[in-house]
Amino acid sequence: MFEIHPVKKVSVVIPVYNEQESLPELIRRTTAACESLGKEYEILLIDDGSSDNSAHMLVEASQAEGSHIVSILLNRNYGQHSAIMAGFSHVTGDLIITLDADLQNPPEEIPRLVAKADEGYDVVGTVRQNRQDSWFRKTASKMINRLIQRTTGKAMGDYGCMLRAYRRHIVDAMLHCHERSTFIPILANIFARRAIEIPVHHAEREFGESKYSFMRLINLMYGLVTCLTTTPLRMLSLLGSIIAIGGFSIAVLLVILRLTFGPQWAAEGVFMLFAVLFTFIGAQFIGMGLLGEYIGRIYTDVRARPRYFVQQVIRPSSKENE
């Protein structure tokens, strides 16, 4: 049996991108939830290159008297997961909770995650109940969840919900991973010995609009497939074998038909030959596109560029920037 260490300090990591309308309420509610824990805590807000007034508001929040807020300002937009990784690199707590800034997942759920982590779990995930998203977002989320479960073999119910708790050793393990394409919930589950999911409330978005457009969801799906598993390459090899066998069978059939019915029939079969040809060409292009995705990610990783660049870090203990 492994010794269960009680949580002493909680770090809440929240990526922020153009959320100036929700920030005051986010800070108030998150601070209140953390105060109710009766433990040490810090709230890390990472500005992911916002074009509105979010960065300035974060700096002011960190410099306020009695603040527990650490503001991390990135020089441009790197994406949600890169921003969270930037926050992970500055946490000091032994339990790290991630939360979205849109308040669709209430900060009031934080004490429940801490209590469950205190039972000895490495990762505490969440499943959104009564989701208040559009039909398209719900459908896309279900498809992505099923895709992840099949390709990774990790049976988690809601990978899209970022309200999660991670023990410090899980976060440290993730920080040692250097791939550019990172999907934090899956990466954490790879290192977790004990993981669990709990149901949480899901509210309507009150401020702003979702940052995930249709194309960003498509890009996310491609990224998940190509960065998490080589199964599509194996499926591509299998598909190529099936097509090759099918093509050979059709060729044999065409020879037999020509010998049976003569050259006149062969002339009338030109369109079928074109159809078969276009089928093979289409399959080749699909395969080349998939290989291109993998090669592109290999190229990106080989360059070894940083995931993000931190421009400033403002801690509540000092008004000086790091």
UniProtKB/Swiss-Prot annotation:
A Pfam family matched in the record: Glycos_transf_2
Enzyme class: transferase
Cytoplasmic side: 1-235, 291-322
Gene Ontology MF, one: undecaprenyl-phosphate 4-deoxy-4-formamido-L-arabinose transferase activity
Keywords from the named record: Antibiotic resistance, Cell inner membrane, Cell membrane, Glycosyltransferase, Lipid A biosynthesis, Lipid biosynthesis, Lipid metabolism, Lipopolysaccharide biosynthesis, Membrane, Transferase, Transmembrane, Transmembrane helix
SUPFAM superfamilies on file: Nucleotide-diphospho-sugar transferases
Main location: membrane
Topology of the protein relative to the lipid bilayer: Multi-pass membrane protein
Catalytic activity annotation: UDP-4-deoxy-4-formamido-beta-L-arabinose + di-trans,octa-cis-undecaprenyl phosphate = 4-deoxy-4-formamido-alpha-L-arabinopyranosyl di-trans,octa-cis-undecaprenyl phosphate + UDP
GO terms for biological process, alphabetical: 4-amino-4-deoxy-alpha-L-arabinopyranosyl undecaprenyl phosphate biosynthetic process; lipid A biosynthetic process; lipopolysaccharide biosynthetic process; response to antibiotic
Family: Belongs to the glycosyltransferase 2 family.
UniProt protein name: Undecaprenyl-phosphate 4-deoxy-4-formamido-L-arabinose transferase
Naturally occurring in which organism (per UniProt): Escherichia coli O127:H6 (strain E2348/69 / EPEC)
Lineage: Bacteria, Pseudomonadati, Pseudomonadota, Gammaproteobacteria, Enterobacterales
Gene that produces this protein: arnC
